[in-house]
Amino acid sequence: MTLYEQLVIELTNRSFSLHAAYRSGSTPYELSDREPEPYDQQIEDFARMIEEADCVLVGGGDFYYEDNATYRKHFGKFAERYGFKGAFEGSFYRWPTAEARWGYLATFLDTTLNAPLRKPYRDLDAILAEKDFFVLTTNQDTQFVKLYPWEKVAEIQGDHRFFQCSRCCTDAVWDAVEPVSNMVEAMGDGLEVPTELVPRCPHCGAEAFPWVRGYGNFLQGELYEEQYRKVSEWLDAHARQRILFLELGVGRMTPAFIQEPFWALTAQLPQASYIAVNNKTQFLPRAIEDRGLAVRADIADVLADVRKTLGR
């Protein structure tokens, strides 16, 4: 088992006994009580910490698909029929048939897979332009792998570009891009896909689903372990350097995958530093307050302002 995976497991197990704190949206860690600096100063500090770091480990967390113009464009027919307010509502709806479920999932996956690279990602890329970096993400929206090569990204919660067997009869995953395109084309203006296009495992015939945690029995096989190997090897190679752990948008559902490991590693590595950007919380542990920065603001605004400050 790799270093980072072991750390995630330990922190996840610890969280079970502290469920009340997490359920309330808080954290059991002792947080800094220092008054945050004004926003403009935080942006200056962010830019300075980027420049001072030898390397950066980015932790990309939650990005939400809300009820906006883009959502209505792609999902309007489902919103009108079922009353959904955002794309993720439909992902876990109790659908009456597999054909109806895949009508929605195919639309969701097609929209995700073909979405253009969003500006916050372009701004982040400019910020990291002169740095040795690696990206660890719990996002499955493929934005990071559109931007960076496979070896520079660890997707520890899966990837919408792949299908897996719902029974986990095989360790293999397979391409989802072409089947998704075929389902969307066949569905047209309707709400359901043809029965013969419902994705199935080529080995046992069971229904397939996206290789993403949350859809069912998430396959934690070779591809999953590869994600942890990549980030663990990067950490091992850079442990003696000035690593900046950059946490972007980690929510309260899964803090043990990015946030808490970043806190632990910052505390353990004497030259490490830490930045968190979140529009809902401003958590900075007391143990790393002298080497940390927590910015409560919109990620898109922060990254745009840091990029401007750096002149990139």
Whereabouts are the PLM-identified features?
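Conserved catalytic alpha/beta core of Sir2/sirtuin-type deacylases, generalized to analogous enzyme cores
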Residues: 1-312
